[in-house]
Every structure is written in structure tokens, then in C-alpha cells.
Design a protein with these regions (language model features):
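Extracytoplasmic/periplasmic copper-protein system
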Residues: 131
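Active-site rim/adjacent substrate-binding subdomains
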Residues: 1-105, 117, 121-124, 134-135
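Catalytic glutamate of the conserved HExxH
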Residues: 109, 113-117
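Short, glycine/acidic-rich hinge or "gate" loops at secondary-structure transitions
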Residues: 127-128
Length: 135
């Protein structure tokens, strides 16, 4: 299904949607995500793409960069805060091509990337998503 060329959500819209997704989580998860920065970029950088072995900038919709909480220590200092980046153009393309609700898409990608903050791998996240779909 291809969506008509509706005005795409702005970066500010997407940032609000992602923040709302985080706020929808139970409090103990929100507390652990309090220092995670959410960034909206048009596309991933070459360095970001290379870090996850993805060739095309159109194929990456979100990325977690940072140390998962199970690898953090109270003695860590000088680290940048963890970042969840959402890539606007690939997300808009997926929204237009699939017809999925844009808010649901942002929620899905944001929560997926937040899962990496808790130490979950892509395989772990996909297994949880599949299990949730079968409930």
C-alpha cells in the first residue's frame, strides 16, 4: 500500500511522538531511560550505517548508541549520554510504502531501540515482538 503524498511529520512531531512512547512505559523503565537522548536526523551517517552493517541509508530507521545499562558502572565518567536516533526520511518512506500508522511506527522503533539500552539484542527484540503479536 502506498500512501498519497501527505505532508510528512516534522522532526519536532517525531520527537514528541518518541517522547510520548517513552512516557507510556512503566515507571521503572522510564527511570532507566531518563538520561537517554532522543535525536531525529534525516538519515544515518555512514559511520552509523557501518556500525550495524547496513549499506543503504534508506534501510536504517533507528539506532541506539551507548552502553546498555547492564554494562554501565557507577565509576564510569566522561561518557556521552546514550542516544536513540530516529531517521526521518527512512521512516517516512516506510510509512508511505506500508500504510502503517505513523505514530505506531515511531512507537515501535523507539521501543525497539530502548530495548537495546536494557541489553536486548535485535534477535531478543524480534522474539519479544513475535511473542507479543501472538497474544
Amino acid at each position: 500500500m502506498t500512501r498519497p503524498l501527505l505532508p510528512p511529520p516534522t522532526a519536532a512531531d517525531m520527537e514528541q511522538m518518541a517522547a510520548s512512547s517513552i512516557r507510556s512505559l512503566p515507571e521503572h523503565f522510564r527511570r532507566e531511560l531518563a538520561d537517554v537522548v532522543i535525536k531525529i536526523e534525516e538519515f544515518a551517517t555512514r559511520e552509523q550505517l557501518d556500525s550495524v552493517d547496513i549499506a543503504s541509508r534508506w534501510d536504517l530507521t533507528g539506532l541506539y548508541e551507548g552502553r546498555p545499562i547492564d554494562e554501565q558502572s557507577q565509576w564510569d565518567s566522561g561518557d556521552l549520554p546514550p542516544i536513540i536516533s530516529l531517521f526521518r526520511q527512512p521512516l517516512i518512506r516506510e510509512w508511505r510504502e506500508t500504510g502503517v500508522d505513523f505514530g505506531a511506527l515511531i512507537h515501535h522503533v523507539t521501543i525497539h531501540e530502548a530495548g537495546h539500552h536494557f541489553g536486548l539484542s535485535d534477535d531478543d527484540m524480534h522474539a519479544l515482538e513475535d511473542a507479543a503479536d501472538n497474544i
